[in-house]
Amino acid sequence: MAKKTSLFECQHCGFTSPKWLGKCVQCNAWESFIELNQTQKEVLNALKKPLPQVQKSVSIAEIEHEEVIKFSSTQSELDIVLGGGIAKGGLYLVGGSPGVGKSTLLLKVASGLAKNQQKVLYVSGEESLSQIKMRATRLDCIEEELYLLNEINWPVIKANMESENYFACVIDSIQTLYSPEISSAPGSISQVREITFELMRLAKTRDIAIFIIGHITKEGSIAGPRVLEHMVDSVLYFEGDPSRELRILRSFKNRFGPTSEIGLFEMKEQGLVSAKEASSLFFSKEEPMEGSAITITLEGSRALILEIQALVSECSFGAPKRLANGFDTNRLNMLIALLEKKLEIPLNRHDVFINVSGGIKISEPACDLAVIASILSSFKNRKIDNKTAFLGEVSLNGRILEAPNLNARLKEMENYGFLKAILPKKPSQKTSIKCYEANVVGKIVEWM
């Protein structure tokens, strides 16, 4: 009798081994090997066999250029993030924490497309049809061309998508679907990977724009194999505190446009709506307080006015704390060391806390000057005029470097009635903002 052979596969990188391994030798993942059944082994072996006919390569100069056809998602902020709209045949992955509004946003998108007489399918494995209908009624999303399907069996969903000429499809969520051909539970890495691959083929062969909702892990990444993010055309993350109105949509991958844009939404009674006057959500118009400084950051092509808040308090014992919300803690430590060295401010005996209002995360160094100004304001208990903004990157030798795309930042200040700007060099274009030059960090003390 022939001995039964086993084959184990890593669920992260696909590495195969004839025996179970605790740690993958290729990607170093722990406890990631599962045993393949006979059908899966046959498929894997078939893929490794040489093809009977090899496709001939084509010169890139001979290939006809085809423009990517895009259409509006009916949500202006989502169109900005996607680079002008939804691409036909695009596969989009949307992740975010529970309750942030992923299903609400895509239900609004599906309803908007259906309102334009486009047939849209919304597949839900988490909610019943009556629950979706109740939510759609509350959001005013009832449309004749919006079709609902409550199903988790992938072959049934696939047959439904192939039987009708759908313009777009929403899968809510990928972790609830399962295929009987794969001997693992719904939401497992094998199930998610194989079903996503099938969705990718459907999107490309039938020109259907497909949105996939994905759960996230406790670390904040989308649950499932890393290959999932490589298979899709765009990866979008929905951020925001469910207890607050503001939501931020970020693009971390986009084959059809830039990845630096963000979309701003507000959770209202009628659901998620595109935010108007976005900058007003991130700074206070009240009387100035100690520890607050204004700056302007660029998110893609959009300039946003932000309020940096600092709290400096005397440390009673132990090592002082340095905590930052929305700002890089390592960069904060660097700026504190710079203040101690250049301005001889004894922050080594003080706790320093930084917060960026509105819950947005700063990724560019052009906000360094505002962080330093807010720390000095809190340390000296002096208020800074809330019509003054600080713009500039601070180097390790104490010099202040010019912020890129300065004219766009000053234009945003003009729109909201700001009067003064502290920066290393005056702008090349005329502006109503009164600009004061400060090329070294020591000159900031003059404004305290």
Swiss-Prot record:
Cellular component annotations (GO), alphabetically ordered: cytosol
Statement: the UniProt record of this protein carries the keyword DNA-binding: yes
UniProt-listed Enzyme Commission number(s): 3.6.4.-
Keyword DNA damage: yes
Family statement: Belongs to the RecA family. RadA subfamily.
Residues at which ATP binds: 96-103
Lineage: Bacteria, Pseudomonadati, Campylobacterota, Epsilonproteobacteria, Campylobacterales
GO molecular function annotations of the record: ATP binding; ATP hydrolysis activity; ATP-dependent DNA damage sensor activity; damaged DNA binding; zinc ion binding
Name of this chain's protein: DNA repair protein RadA
Taxonomic source organism: Helicobacter pylori (strain J99 / ATCC 700824) (Campylobacter pylori J99)
Protein's job: DNA-dependent ATPase involved in processing of recombination intermediates, plays a role in repairing DNA breaks. Stimulates the branch migration of RecA-mediated strand transfer reactions, allowing the 3' invading strand to extend heteroduplex DNA faster. Binds ssDNA in the presence of ADP but not other nucleotides, has ATPase activity that is stimulated by ssDNA and various branched DNA structures, but inhibited by SSB. Does not have RecA's homology-searching function.
GO-annotated biological processes: recombinational repair
Residue window of motif RadA KNRFG motif: 253-257
Broad enzyme group: hydrolase
Top-rank taxon: Bacteria
Domain notes: Has a putative N-terminal zinc-finger, a middle region with homology to RecA with ATPase motifs including the RadA KNRFG motif, while the C-terminus is homologous to Lon protease.
Zinc finger C4-type: from-to: 10-27
Entry keywords, A to Z: ATP-binding, DNA damage, DNA repair, DNA-binding, Hydrolase, Metal-binding, Nucleotide-binding, Stress response, Zinc, Zinc-finger
Region (Lon-protease-like): 351-448
InterPro entries: AAA+_ATPase, DNA_repair_RadA, P-loop_NTPase, RecA_ATP-bd, Ribosomal_Su5_D2-typ_SF, Ribsml_uS5_D2-typ_fold_subgr, Rubredoxin_2
